[in-house]
């Protein structure tokens, strides 16, 4: 939520962010969009405003992080929005339970934070198998730690249904040829 706080320092008008998302979606009609929001941001905007925005503009997939409890998540699911939950590599039981009770894909941390490995599930494939054994049949996408082609291969071999690549690509936004080359390099491993 630090990034959103910084963004709100620059512009505190949520409507401008929402207008930007709508414009981006209109300019890219063949692209699937997944929103990411912190629960506290939804509360700041007002739950009803956020739900109405998502439904009116067909933003039906949401990664929801920073949950205080299941209230907002459950309201979003009831409204027809697919809510995906983030599960840390060490398989925090509260996060696993939240993912089980959700209706979107699972966003699983691809690589552990130093010192935060569940000794019963030390490898990514073990984490994925554990989530499957708990009854999760929806896609499991891995992110946070996917930087190089070998990271994509590792996630694929572990049984991930897909990956998220963040900063590696975002850092190249001013160098389109390098950006395109990096995306191709990563996609070649899929």
Language-model-detected regions and their locations in the chain:
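Glycine-rich phosphate-binding active-site loops on the catalytic face of alpha/beta enzymes
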Residues: 57-71, 107-116, 156-179
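Active-site beta-loop-alpha junctions enriched in small/polar residues
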Residues: 36-41, 67, 86-88, 111-113, ...
